[in-house]
Amino acid sequence: MIWPLPEPPVSERWRAWPVSQIFPETVPGVSPSGARVTYVLAGVAPEAPCRTAFQLAALRRGCRVALRATYADSTQTFVATVGIAVLDSPWSGSYRAGRLATVRPVAFPRGPAERFGERQYFTGVVVGSHENYMVATAAGYTDGRPYQPGDRVLPRLRDTARQLATALYRALTR
């Protein structure tokens, strides 16, 4: 009889889990109207130093490494980069949203995220509590439109950022 391997401690999952478990191919969500939404993985970036992966004001003391992936909604209207900061000790922050300092967007060629960059991110979310991870998102439009101060953020775009950050944080820390 083969016994199942024990689940790795939460603080080691970033290293022990396969990338497909940290960043699954699809993440389910719900639109503001209650319709089902699916976020589809556009690509996974290589591990990066925290200073490269996060905007300076988003950096947290004790950040060891950053993991990033970009998702698009199934209509290929919205795109969001999810960044996971692996920390030396639990983060005592809380949920924050808006156009705050966050993860640096990652574009992937020949797909819905090919025109996504720092000028294209409209909104983001930072999630974390009492674990060695902080999860941040930066969300924008797949058409590459740049953010202009005063631009209105659609509820669906805001939900994209929130749902991806929350779902991936919960999966990693459950």
Regions found by a protein language model. Name each.
Residues 40-44, 80-84, 150-151:
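Second-shell loop/turn segments in exported
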Residues 48-49, 90-91, 155:
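Soluble non-cytosolic domains of exported or imported proteins
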Residues 50, 54, 62, 92-99, ...:
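Stable alpha-helical elements in mature extracytoplasmic
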Residues 59-98, 104:
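Mid-length scaffold segments of soluble, non-membrane domains
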Residues 108-174:
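Extracellularly exposed regions in secreted/surface proteins, prominently low-complexity, repeat-rich
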